Amino acid sequence: MHLTLFKELLKQPKPKFHFEIEPNVSFLAVEEGPASLRSYSIGNVSRIYDGIRVPPKPEEPLNCCQSGCAICVWDVYADDLEEYNRARRKAKRHYLDKHLPVPPDLAKVSLKETSSLEELPPQLKAFVLLEKRLMKDKQSKNN
């Protein structure tokens, strides 16, 4: 009985969308900060849409110390979020250009280039912008 059911399940048609799930992969360069500054839930994995890799959606950090670190977890989060959104736009554009059906999880992706900081709550957006400005000021003083 169970063997017959299992064989029937194996005969199920495959989905029409071309994407694969791969283990979590770090997408930022090593000099931008250690991977320990990032946090992902189990199951939050990178995907490949018809050959285009989309990193896992970054999660808001819970471990910011608010002391002005050289590499703040919020800076890493903002950069990861920007890369995530850029990759999703690229994947959706690829499907549209090839006149392929767009996967449901890319259907609501806007092709308009916007700052990923717009997705943050206003207080966090202001904090991240302040951190980035302070980091630029610090770098310009060192040069």
Swiss-Prot record:
Main localization (coarse): mitochondrion
Location of this chain's protein in the cell: Mitochondrion
Residue stretches making up the Oxidoreductase-like domain: 48-93
GO molecular function, one term: oxidoreductase activity
Protein name: UPF0651 protein P31B10.02, mitochondrial
GO (cellular component) term, any one: mitochondrion
Transmembrane segments: none
Keywords: Mitochondrion, Transit peptide
Similarity section: Belongs to the UPF0651 family.
